Structure formats: C-alpha cells, structure tokens
C-alpha cells in the first residue's frame, strides 16, 4: 500500500511538533482554572489528546487512500452543500450555539464544531477541481465566485469577520494560482474589496445611530480596542491588555513551563485564542519564535511542493492548504500583538479545539498524500529508465 511512497518529514515533522507543544500548553493553560472551578484539571488535556489520536488516524487513512477516491466530485459537492446548509441553519437558530455573542458553533450529538471550517476544506477541494483542466479561465467563472461570496457572507453574519476574510484570502490565492487573466482578477478583487468597504461602512453608520444589530456589537467593541486596550482595561480591552502583560512577563527565555501568571484567571481564553501569549510567557521570545518557525516551515514546505506538481488540481489543493494555515496563523498572531482586532481565530495545531484540529489534520493528510505521490511518480520514471538501459546496450552490441 505504501510501496514507493516516502513520507515528507518537512510537513509531518512540524505538524507533530506543534501538536505536542499545543497539547502540553493546553494542560498548562487550563489546569489552574479547572482546578479552581472544582473540575478535573486534566479534562481538556485528555479531550484534546483523544482528538489528536483520532486526527493522526485520519492522517494515516488520508495518506493511504488513492487521491482520486478522496477527490470524487460527488463527495466534494455533498460536503460543500452540507456545510453551506449548516451555515444557513445557524442563522435560523437550528443546532446553533452562541458563545461570546457569536453564533459560530453547531452542536450535533453533543459535539460542537464550526461549519465554516468544514466549508473551508471543501471549498479548497471544489475550487481545485473547478480549475483542474488547465491554467485558462473556464467560461463559467461566475459559479465559483458566487459560491465563495455566498459562503463568505454566511460566515460574516455569524459574525465571524476574520473567518470571512480567510475564505476570501484562500479563494483569492487559488484564483491567482489558476492564472486568471489580470482584467478578470482585478474585477473580482475590486468587487470583494468594495463589498467589504460597503459592509464596514454600514456597520459604522448603524453604530453612529445606535442601530447596530446585537450580533455585531462585540465585533465593533474589539475593533475599537485595537489601538489602546488599556483605555478600558477591565472591560472590552481586558483580554488584549492581559495578553500584553503575558508577552512582557515572558521576556527572552520565559518564566518556565507551567509558571504563567496571566493564565490564572487573567486571560479567560488562555488555552484557545490566546495560547500563544501563554507560550510567550512560559518560554519567552525564544520559545514563541520557535513555534512561529515551525508554522512557517510547514507552510513554506507545502508551497514548495505545490510548485513541483504537474497535476493542476494537486497544485491548487496545496496552495489552498498552505494559504489556510498561513492566513490563520497571521490573524491569530496579529490579534495577540494588537495589529488587528481580536478575532477568535485559533492558532493552528496548537490551540485547544478538537474538531478544528481534526479538519486541519485532514488537510495535512491531503498534503502528505500529494507529496508522496510525487515521489512515487519519480520512482516509476527511474524504473522505466532502468528497464530501457539493457535494451539500448543490446542494440549497441
């Protein structure tokens, strides 16, 4: 089954290292809060550990199955339709779970997950198939544009502004890699930017007249706190200001594993959105930069592999997966550093969140499958050349 296939350790290695770091930091960041609340301090650690084991099984399965089976059109279309329906149903309150003023989660059979993450992976698969034949632009370009726009709007009104931007960024990268003509590309980009400006202007206008819908209020508060969270240190700027304290406390080498101060009630989302702050406090600037290096190495390796693909669909899948990890990392780190508003976007493979980790692991499995297939094709070419050599020698003799 794995004959002539070679695991790409520059993809798998950083993934495994980030998973282990994340698991240890989830325990460190959550144990004190759970202990004070009278819960098992290891409960989140155990839950994440189980999801990691399950996800590693998904990677093995995804790596083992033929790529053509994973990329069947019916599966891709069904996944896209189901995720779109779940996003729409959330606005109707069906299966929806509201957390911190936002309806981003769906709860089915006791399992909570974000449909936007499922939509993202199937959107990558759909777009890669749409542009699979060649690098020219198909005549029906309006179809993927409408699908991307529809999903982005549904995600935006959860509200999840960062999620909508991520979807647009991933789709934009795939469109660019598919070599869309400059004129059509500029029209698409212009329409996307104009739509975002229109939405932002509408939000500001509604806020001015105190008509802002409740589902956008928390997003507006986060935007207002970007420049100086210390103006409302105990209110809207509470998490951001304490994140700054954590970064400052860490210094160059950190306070040591488990010795974070801000995780003790000062940083409510310490094991999810702000886990990077806890890492920086416990392991210092050196440890934080190492985590970023692993994420950067993972992305760059995926992008590098995409440039070597002869198959257009495989190339675009790698572009989409690499962009997803890179943009999600940038948004998470950018919000922690105060460069952009707080977003609620987790750090890939490090933050607590079983289903998020599972879906991203499936994406890594696809990347490993494509990478190993490239090695297999090279081995076949070498075998053909070796078979031809004796024939050539016999002719010469």
Curated annotation (Swiss-Prot):
Its main location: membrane. Residues 1-6, 66-78, 126-136, 182-185, 299-315, 368-397 are cytoplasmic. Its EC number is 2.4.99.28. It catalyses: [GlcNAc-(1->4)-Mur2Ac(oyl-L-Ala-gamma-D-Glu-L-Lys-D-Ala-D-Ala)](n)-di-trans,octa-cis-undecaprenyl diphosphate + beta-D-GlcNAc-(1->4)-Mur2Ac(oyl-L-Ala-gamma-D-Glu-L-Lys-D-Ala-D-Ala)-di-trans,octa-cis-undecaprenyl diphosphate = [GlcNAc-(1->4)-Mur2Ac(oyl-L-Ala-gamma-D-Glu-L-Lys-D-Ala-D-Ala)](n+1)-di-trans,octa-cis-undecaprenyl diphosphate + di-trans,octa-cis-undecaprenyl diphosphate + H(+). PROSITE patterns: FTSW_RODA_SPOVE. Keywords: Cell cycle, Cell division, Cell membrane, Cell shape, Cell wall biogenesis/degradation, Glycosyltransferase, Membrane, Peptidoglycan synthesis, Transferase, Transmembrane, Transmembrane helix. It is a multi-pass membrane protein. It is found in: Cell membrane. The keyword tRNA processing does not apply. The chain crosses the membrane at residues 7-27, 45-65, 79-99, 105-125, 137-157, 161-181, 186-206, 278-298, 316-336, 347-367. The keyword Hydrolase does not apply. One of its GO terms (cellular component) is cell division site. GO terms for molecular function: lipid-linked peptidoglycan transporter activity; peptidoglycan glycosyltransferase activity. One of its GO terms (biological process) is regulation of cell shape. It holds the Pfam family FTSW_RODA_SPOVE. Pathway: Cell wall biogenesis; peptidoglycan biosynthesis. InterPro entries: Cell_cycle_FtsW-rel_CS, FtsW/RodA. Residues 28-44, 100-104, 158-160, 207-277, 337-346 are extracellular. Peptidoglycan polymerase that is essential for cell division. Belongs to the SEDS family. FtsW subfamily. This is Probable peptidoglycan glycosyltransferase FtsW. It comes from Enterococcus hirae. The lineage of its organism: Bacteria, Bacillati, Bacillota, Bacilli, Lactobacillales.
